[in-house]
């Protein structure tokens, strides 16, 4: 995420509208924060009530991975600030379709006595991924579009890889629930 967000996004803005780079990056960050926050809450709630043979979380993680690929490719093609904002916010929604269910999965599948350890492992992996993503992103500063495409495909791989490693059990036998505002 930070490979695109912290490195390639500002470089892309520089290509489109260099005279207003700081303002546009701030606009993108602000809009993305709102989209990500709302998406995390809503998608987390919907993943709680999802019933499928692949489990509650896995379908959202896979859909988020595919959506992240598509929205990053859309962002890469953006030629205006408006298109960048819409594509970037769409990416945040898709990215949170990976993050929210993944975090909920940890709560679902890990025994309470092991949650501290698993949370530490998750945090360690998160930090490595964030800084590693910036290192990878920086390799593409002279070819920003290529870098965004590479990062989009890396994000696409993340969901199926997580699903293969985790193997969430079916949720078809769980009692059905309906989405309510209380879930938010």
Model feature map: region roles:
Residues 32-37, 116-141:
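Glycine-rich segments within core transmembrane alpha-helices of 12-TM secondary carriers
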Residues 169-184:
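Juxtamembrane intracellular "pre-TM" segments in multi-pass secondary transporters
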Residues 25-47:
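Central cavity-lining transmembrane alpha-helices of secondary-active solute carriers
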Residues 1-33:
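Helix-loop boundary and gating motifs at the non-cytosolic
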Residues 90-124:
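Cytoplasmic helix-loop-helix junction between adjacent transmembrane helices
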